Every structure is written in C-alpha cells, then in structure tokens.
Amino acid sequence: VRSSAASDVYKRQAYEVFDKDGSFLAVLYTDFHPRAGKRSGAWMTSYKEQWIENGVNSRPHVSVTMNFTKPSAGKPALLTFSEVNTFLHEFGHALHGMFANTTYSTMSGTSVYWDFVELPSQIMENFATEKEFLNTFARHYQTGEPIPAELIQKIVDASNFNVAYALSLIHISEPTRHS
C-alpha cells in the first residue's frame, strides 16, 4: 500500500493498493474518525467500480468509513470488539471491490446479486476471533501482552449463545419454508 496525496481531504487517508506483483489494484480511501456534519455509523462506498473495456482494466476507487473515537492527549483510542468486527465487515466489502476483475461494472464488487453481496464481509468478520490474526496487532496498550486465549473463547461462546433457540424460532415462524 502506498500513500497518495490525491487531495487535501484525503491527504493522509488515500492509498494506492498494489498486488504482490506490483500491479495497481485500487485506490482505497479511509475516513475513521467523527467530525462535524458526518453521519454516525460505518459503511463502505464504491466511488468507481471496476470494469474492462477494449482490453483496459479500469480499477476501482473505494472507501471505508468508520466513526472510531479519536485518541486523546497521551492516550490511544482503543477499539471495542464490536468496532473491530464492524471494521472487518466494511473492509470485506472494500476487498470485494478492490479485487474485482470483470468485464461489466454492474457485476463488480458490491454490485453483485444480493444473496452474495454480504459474503466477503461476513467472512472477514470471522477474523475478529482468530487468535493468529489478533496476535498480529491486538495487544494491551500498556503491557504489550496479547489478548488471552480464554477471553477470545469467551467472546466466541457469547456470540454463539442462544443460536439454536433463534434458529428454532425461525423454523416455528415458517415451518414449511425451513424444513
């Protein structure tokens, strides 16, 4: 990833993304902190889809927008598990767009059928509880210790709580459809 000074707005938040062989993949814009006039929440935006026309591969421009708390004087901004999960979800959409390689922009990135559009982002969410992934960056900001495996397991267990009950409610609400 190479930083790009595309405009003052994204001076430190625009990145030209290259494949391992050095070929240009996309422009990624990031906007991580709240400011006056910015709506709340998190989202991915595709400013320019990918497409191929007359042998020329037009690469996408995408953004990931979050509203992480800004760091304060002498203290880092720490992310909650929910914020990490949301970031991974939106980054999954961005990856879907950046890795697109199709003839028609209408089938590129998140412009796919609705039954598939969430798949890459939901796959990315799984990294939030992968010890190997977390150990690369998720450390206590004062001691440098990694997140204990027991805590990661508690998060996984909590996310699976009542799953069978919820599934049974779906079956009860529409038994013939979910048989």
Task: Label the predicted regions.
Residues 1, 5-10, 174-176:
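Short, small-residue-biased leader/transition segments that mark boundaries at the very start
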Residues 3-7, 97-106:
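Surface-exposed helix-capping loop/turn segments at secondary-structure junctions
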Residues 2, 80, 84-87, 116-120, ...:
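Hydrophobic (often cysteine-bearing) scaffold residues that line and stabilize catalytic clefts
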Residues 55-72, 92-100, 144-152:
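Active-site-adjacent bridging/hinge elements
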Residues 18, 23-24, 30, 100-169, ...:
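Acidic/histidine-rich catalytic neighborhood
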Residues 8-11, 16-86:
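Active-site-adjacent "gating/activation" loops or surface patches in catalytic cores
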Residues 82-97, 121, 176:
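Active-site recognition of the HExxH zinc-binding catalytic motif
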